[in-house]
Amino acid sequence: MLTIQFLCPLPNGLHARPAWELKEQCSQWQSEITFINHRQNAKADAKSSLALIGTGTLFNDSCSLNISGSDEEQARRVLEEYILVRFIDSDSVQPTQAELTAHPLPRSLSRLNPDLLYGNVLASGVGVGTLTLLQSDSLDSYRAIPASAQDSTRLEHSLATLAEQLNQQLRERDGESKTILSAHLSLIQDDEFAGNIRRLMTEQHQGLGAAIISNMEQVCAKLSASASDYLRERVSDIRDISEQLLHITWPELKPRNNLVLEKPTILVAEDLTPSQFLSLDLKNLAGMILEKTGRTSHTLILARASAIPVLSGLPLDAIARYAGQPAVLDAQCGVLAINPNDAVSGYYQVAQTLADKRQKQQAQAAAQLAYSRDNKRIDIVANIGTALEAPGAFANGAEGVGLFRTEMLYMDRDSAPDEQEQFEAYQQVLLAAGDKPIIFRTMDIGGDKSIPYLNIPQEENPFLGYRAVRIYPEFAGLFRTQLRAILRAASFGNAQLMIPMVHSLDQILWVKGEIQKAIVELKRDGLRHAETITLGIMVEVPSVCYIIDHFCDEVDFFSIGSNDMTQYLYAVDRNNPRVSPLYNPITPSFLRMLQQIVTTAHQRGKWVGICGELGGESRYLPLLLGLGLDELSMSSPRIPAVKSQLRQLDSEACRELARQACECRSAQEIEALLTAFTPEEDVRPLLALENIFVDQDFSNKEQAIQFLCGNLGVNGRTEHPFELEEDVWQREEIVTTGVGFGVAIPHTKSQWIRHSSISIARLAKPVDWQSEMGEVELVIMLTLGANEGMNHVKVFSQLARKLVNKNFRQSLFAAQDAQSILTLLETELTF
């Protein structure tokens, strides 16, 4: 018997999706494989999803896989790589607490006296629709169905039918929906799930309906006893597949909650299963109020992926009397506004306008090329493993793909992919990319990524073993097939080739020879292909660093694999808990090595990127920029934040930071240096076109202040528009800011404003400013930083003096557009 020991790396524990993936990995082996949770002293058949879920395994639990059988050595090698490298990817990223924390109710809403119910935010957003109550169905009618001689046959038929339905949905869905449906399919195909129903029928003589319900209750009870909220919330998945089985077996007992949404609807229910959610017309699902759903339920994951706002914490009996009435579900402030009046509806119309502006701006920002504040260009690209990931990466702002892990095509299968399959996969991502560069890393297999059909013997230390470019000469036909596929696909886009684990010039010279042979073959075969291809290497073996100058004669670029390079530089196995604390790329030796690579390559006209985890670490972005790296490749969700941060950094300041870091004596000194490093704030003018509006159709004072404060949030002048608005209203409480002549000057000094601003809205029609000075047609809002000293008084005084001048006022009211107002103010005012 062989054993793999590990700590559970899953932040949410071993729930349905990772259990399904682990079961799939284990089921391909003939050996018996037992999963053990040592904290719980719980054992499970690793080829049963349900049994795995039942172990109650939480993050960082001590676990092991015991493997016994004819193929145990191969199984251990492959499963160890999966557990240590890929298992964590089977878990889902959950929203942060900040994302689920309701904003304080803005004064521009509370002053309108809305009829509100308060709840808890589960999925952020705002939805407008009719409140519709979904009643829960009792299962008593199924439980009461007497046992029948046909029950066993009916069970098999129902299981097969449900599996067929789930498979059909899998073919039609993608993203989170597909992942959750796969987990459900795994559960109903699980021997333990069906086996327990059969045992209840044979040993306890229960009818099929009662047995399905009893099995559901037993599994749910076990999950409900878990210490993990995430595992407790998997109860909904068990209930879901059990209820689907009941409905398939007795279709005549049609559930009352078969809901069709014919207009925008806010759905109110005790809970909603994933299959119920997927059956809804999402175009008309404005939001949901779910009394008992937890923050990590699969229904919530689907809702977030579909941008459906959700609240909880509202008792159904408190909402039932409002059924059929219009409402606004505000899952930003955590409230339900019942039967909103015109003023409240107007507030949410303004909120939607601001949300649309923000979404448009974010899309534009993501599409922009990445530059530092002083216009230093750096490519921000994505790491992906399949062509399906490419569109999402580009939507996040990826300027290309810095690492396409082609080895994913070779894994978890019985034979290697043929040339056509590879060509189609590579072509797909290139077509999605347009002219964006795609760097295909040739197959990084062998060693820690064992491929059974290659029959590479097990090694003591696979990370230092027979892998990547080292295996290519033995498997030259396999490598040539991949080269042909990439060269064919390269004729459809900007393809580049990268070779992993290179340590000598001989290896790259051999590879270049194989590329030429592949080109000759493709010409002979009459297949469309690229005549040349940009070639680079992964820099992950330290020996390469000392002969970068020689490699510059043979390749076009370098990409530093920081994960493996760190291991090899320090002789540290990052998966060994006794030495993993030594694994740290932010040390003087590592940074000096990066500096040497970049300097030497740049001197010879070659570019250098980084594609390990370090590339997406925002804390270390100033160092990477300062070291002169030309490209950062990372997981695509990190790209928007990295691009945004880069725009705040001055490359010269970062270069000095990197120089100082390379002179440090320890990692601790470098971390202290980073902590003390404060990027210089981008200076923005007090007056800017982005904050000036003409002919704004506001109904009241509240909308004007809401819009102007919210717009400052959209434009990045404040990260806290609600808090800034509160400061404006506090000033309004002291004395109204209507100054006469149809003008109001709301103002504040606030800690919440990053860039002091003057915002202007000329209104389409006057509004009541609740001031003795009459209605207002022009709003000039001053929001100045808390550290501005007496500057706010100077600005206010200048404006007030100018506004007394009739000609100045008339010019403001007569200006044709926002640019004309900006030009007038810049001419007349000095700050």
Curated annotation (Swiss-Prot):
GO CC terms, sorted: cytoplasm; membrane
Encoding gene (name): fryA
Catalytic activity, EC: 2.7.3.9, 2.7.1.202
Presence of the UniProt keyword Transferase in the record: yes
UniProt-annotated location(s): Cytoplasm
Cofactor(s) recorded in Swiss-Prot or TrEMBL: Mg(2+)
Residues the record lists as binding phosphoenolpyruvate: R405, R441, N563, D564, R574
Name the record gives this protein: Multiphosphoryl transfer protein
Active site per database record: H15, H298, C611, H747
Chain residue ranges for the region called PTS EI: 119-650
SUPFAM superfamilies linked: Enzyme I of the PEP:sugar phosphotransferase system HPr-binding (sub)domain, HPr-like, Phoshotransferase/anion transport protein, Phosphoenolpyruvate/pyruvate domain, Phosphohistidine domain
Gene Ontology BP annotations: phosphoenolpyruvate-dependent sugar phosphotransferase system
Chief localization: cytoplasm
Free-text note on domains in this protein's UniProt record: The PTS EIIA type-2 domain is phosphorylated by phospho-HPr on a histidyl residue. Then, it transfers the phosphoryl group to the PTS EIIB type-2 domain. In contrast to classical PTS systems, the fructose-like PTS has no requirement for HPr and Enzyme I; FryA combines a IIA domain with an Enzyme I and a HPr domains.
Enzyme class: transferase
Organism: Shigella flexneri
InterPro entries: HPr-like (IPR000032), HPr-like_sf (IPR035895), PEP-util_enz_mobile_dom (IPR008279), PEP-utilizing_PTS_enzyme (IPR050499), PEP_util_C (IPR000121), PEP_util_CS (IPR023151), Phosphohistidine_dom_sf (IPR036637), PTrfase/Anion_transptr (IPR016152)
Residues annotated as domain HPr: 1-90
PANTHER family, per the entry: MULTIPHOSPHORYL TRANSFER PROTEIN 1-RELATED, PHOSPHOENOLPYRUVATE-PROTEIN PHOSPHOTRANSFERASE
